[in-house]
Amino acid sequence: MLKKLNLLLFALLTQLSFSQNSEKCITTKLVNESVTEDVRNYIATEEIATKNNKWRAENSNSVKETIIVPIVVHIVHKNTHVNVGSGTNISDAQIEDAIRILNQDFSKTNIEFPNPPRNTFLNLAADVQIQFCFATTDENGNPTNGITRTSTTKSDWDPDTEANDMKRNNTGGKDGWDPEEYLNIWVCDLYAPPQGGMTLGYSYLPGSVTWSMWKDGLVVDYRYFGTIGVSAPSNDGSTPTHEIGHYLGLMHTFCEEIDGNGNPICCDNDDNNWGGYVDDTPASKDVYWGTVNASTNNNTCNDLSYSNNFNTNVLDMDENFMSYSSDVWMFTHEQSSVMNGTMNGYRSSLKNSPASVNCTGTVGIDNLLDNNQIRIYPNPTKGRVLIQNLMQIPNNSIIVRNILGEIILTSNSRNSLVSLDLSHLENGVYFIDVSSNNGIRIEKVILAK
């Protein structure tokens, strides 16, 4: 059965002829190891991909609503970096910047649009309609700002031998939160070989760690998280975007196969079951590491030789987030379809997570109000929401926002019980901010009339 992996283009990276920079992302290597070590992970990945493709075929014309994903960022820092903002103990501002860029990338509001450096594939660029928001409640319902900080005696982590050690308390890292309710993001110091070619980040395809779910999530080196204090050339802040693409079912857009002599060959790397049969990314050979602009004209494969959506031979899509180019800016419509299929299938528990979230940046944990102070119910609601002030907190200010952060409704009340009527709004996700002199409570509310 495992021989089918070759048909799915999951060759070991050690068999590939990439340059010394080839381990920018080691997802392919890790997935190959996981499904080889435990055949149940292989079976799960295959079944999940098949179900995803079936869902996409059945829902190709459905209207999408923006999906909210609760995230928690685990900063695993050197014990010598005690102060927040020092070295590996990166600042809240850098973390917020990384998530801001992530959400811009997934909504096609990144700085490259509406006029990207080249417009070759402008008509294929998609708004994925998935938004990532800091959790404001942890697994036990306690207030959180969506960031944990763990001091470790480890100087760094070698992705080749310690790829998952930062995810466990007993190996110097931090245990992740329930992966069915939160997207865990570990940020740490990944070992940088003196000869170059360090790993920037990695994650796992849906299902590939079904039998070891504690590994689920993504890892990003602290030097490539956001744009504040990060390192060139991958300083556009899109490393998390690439890794979450894998986490939601996408493969690299460049070919990961070689011929009998070890030379790169042409292939359509994501046009297979595990890749979602993505037909709007052209075939390309090997990896392009450079910048992309109006004069970039790489065309390494004849697209007329492949079954895809192109009726002519087009340039390589080096600007795709799933490539290795040094500046990238787009997902395609079919890539968006794959990721939305994952969120409505294998990762639907994230979509329906009970965790409260904050989509406007982090809030100091000392300023968060918990369920013992403010209660917001029912949730989901058919239109009316009650806000119960359990501690007689003075000067309540209530704001209702949509998923874009736009203010829909405001209210000021000193009453112990406030009733909000949302029945005039469209079905979807809204956020209720209750603030007072004592702090703030942010609740995700689903309106389903």
Regions found by a protein language model. Name each.
Residues F10-F18:
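Hydrophobic h-region of N-terminal signal peptides that target proteins for export
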